[in-house]
């Protein structure tokens, strides 16, 4: 395994650990999710170019589009939560409340 792939896997693992550790605030969770998606995007692009799989060259761009949609929905949820409750705690996002 090359050092670039190892670094990207470590970046993904650190972002995943950040999601698990800093899950009390929505903003920190969203930042860690963006780090995970960015490391997946770079890893997919490098693997596709390394193995010359040009038929799958649109996969990283599709992942990037879904990442942008996820960020937009997450930021809208962050704005709505901070307007309603005054903070960005994840514990305020209870689905049982109407």
From Swiss-Prot:
The reaction(s) this protein catalyses: a ubiquinone + NADH + 5 H(+)(in) = a ubiquinol + NAD(+) + 4 H(+)(out)
Annotated Gene3D superfamilies: 1.10.287.3510
GO terms, biological process: ATP synthesis coupled electron transport
Compartmental location: Mitochondrion inner membrane
Topology within the bilayer: Multi-pass membrane protein
Keywords, sorted A to Z: Electron transport, Membrane, Mitochondrion, Mitochondrion inner membrane, NAD, Respiratory chain, Translocase, Transmembrane, Transmembrane helix, Transport, Ubiquinone
UniProt name for this protein: NADH-ubiquinone oxidoreductase chain 4L
Organism for this UniProt entry: Potorous tridactylus (Potoroo)
């Amino acid at each position: 395994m090359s050092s670039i792939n190892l670094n990207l896997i470590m970046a993904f693992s650190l972002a995943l650990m950040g999601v698990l550790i800093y899950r009390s605030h929505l903003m920190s969770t969203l930042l860690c999710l963006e780090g995970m998606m960015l490391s997946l995007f770079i890893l997919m692009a490098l693997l596709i170019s390394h193995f010359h799989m040009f038929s799958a060259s649109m996969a990283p761009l599709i992942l990037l589009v879904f990442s942008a949609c996820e960020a937009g929905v997450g930021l809208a949820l962050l704005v709505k939560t901070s307007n309603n409750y005054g903070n960005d705690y994840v514990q305020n996002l209870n689905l049982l409340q109407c």
